[in-house]
């Protein structure tokens, strides 16, 4: 069954896209949740009428994504973590950890937009890709540091303030 997306849906596409999905998925999930409508002549006419406003909306979102990319591309996110004696982290740095660290810097993104091959489980410097919009991606630097003593915590605060001032 072909459906027209009424809003962006991560696994299928973006608002206004026509997608082919299984009948049950469309009838039982997408349509009842108002994510999509069935592709038919009436809905195609509606889509054609809405195309201009969709283009304006997409252009606005892309511009906002470019502005956000400019803000975050130079940021180094310092994440303090507890470390075992063998150098491994207690726990790991996940997408949500990165989103929380960015929120402290007043940058709001969705955790689904943070792309990592696997969670970070050791100290060091890493690079993580953030998908901001269709073709607008930004790479941010993640620095995982040891929060063993007060000296390490002070170092983290100094680096965070330096990154915010930059």
Curated annotation (Swiss-Prot):
Gene3D superfamilies: Ribosomal protein L9, C-terminal domain (3.10.430.100), Ribosomal protein L9, N-terminal domain (3.40.5.10). GO terms for biological process: translation. Keywords: Ribonucleoprotein, Ribosomal protein, RNA-binding, rRNA-binding. One of its GO terms (molecular function) is rRNA binding. Pfam families: Ribosomal_L9_C, Ribosomal_L9_N. GO terms for cellular component: ribonucleoprotein complex; ribosome. Coiled coil: none annotated. PROSITE patterns: RIBOSOMAL_L9. PANTHER family: 50S RIBOSOMAL PROTEIN L9. Binds to the 23S rRNA. Belongs to the bacterial ribosomal protein bL9 family. NCBIfam families: L9 (TIGR00158). This is Large ribosomal subunit protein bL9.
């Amino acid at each position: 069954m072909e459906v027209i997306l009424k809003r962006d849906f991560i696994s299928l596409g973006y608002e206004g896209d026509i997608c082919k999905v299984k009948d049950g998925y469309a009838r039982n999930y997408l349509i009842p949740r108002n994510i999509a409508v069935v592709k038919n002549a009436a809905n195609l006419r509606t889509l054609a009428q809405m195309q201009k406003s969709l283009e304006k909306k997409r252009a606005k979102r892309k511009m906002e994504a470019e502005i956000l990319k400019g803000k975050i591309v130079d940021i180094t996110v310092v994440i303090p973590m507890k470390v075992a004696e063998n150098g491994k982290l207690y726990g790991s740095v996940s997408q949500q950890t990165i989103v929380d660290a960015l929120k402290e810097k007043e940058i709001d993104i969705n955790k689904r937009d943070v792309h990592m091959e696997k969670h970070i489980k050791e100290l060091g410097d890493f690079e993580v890709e953030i998908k901001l919009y269709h073709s607008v991606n930004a790479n941010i630097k993640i620095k995982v540091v040891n929060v063993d003593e007060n000296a390490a915590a002070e170092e983290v605060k100094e680096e965070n303030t330096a990154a915010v001032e930059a």
